[in-house]
Regions:
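Proline-centered helix-kink/hinge sites
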Residues: 4, 31-32
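C-terminal terminal-subdomain/extension
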Residues: 2, 67-138
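Compact nucleic-acid interaction/catalytic patches
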Residues: 20-30, 36-73
Length: 138
């Protein structure tokens, strides 16, 4: 199996920051997520930065990008409900040691252009200190 790449969409038990702060350690459900960035750490392991995809419209104080219909089709999600990639909440995981990520079969992948838009928006938010990270291996 190949390593996940930026722009690929998987099912993953995403842990929201509010759940993490309440002491929860596992996501409540497996949901579609997008791999935003992958990097190698000092040990040569693959760190993935994971963003949730939701059908809940973001409130005004949140940061998200709506998923266009063509991208929804590319990854095989339901077209009858609008979707957003949340940019201000990130899970980080290490591929080689993840104990929560069971099914690593991609559902599909966003186009390179849309994946680049997600990545650029995420990096801008992170630089501005407006993105929170939940480390799934802590």
């Amino acid at each position: 199996m190949s390593e996940p790449k930026a722009g690929e969409v998987f099912r993953y038990p995403f842990l929201w920051k509010r759940q993490d702060l309440q002491g929860e350690t596992e996501g409540r459900k497996s949901r579609p997520v997008c791999i935003a960035v992958t990097i190698a750490n000092a040990n040569g392991e693959t760190v993935v930065f994971i963003l949730p995809i939701t059908t809940q419209p973001p409130i005004a104080s949140r940061h998200a990008v709506e998923v266009p219909d063509i991208e929804v089709r590319r990854v095989g999600l339901d077209l009858h409900v609008r979707k957003w990639v949340m940019l201000d909440e990130i899970n980080t995981d290490i591929i080689e040691r993840s104990w929560v990520w069971e099914d690593r079969t991609p559902m599909g992948a966003f186009s390179p252009a849309y994946a680049a838009q997600i990545r650029a928006s995420l990096l801008a938010l992170a630089k501005a200190g407006k993105a929170s990270i939940t480390d799934r291996l802590k």
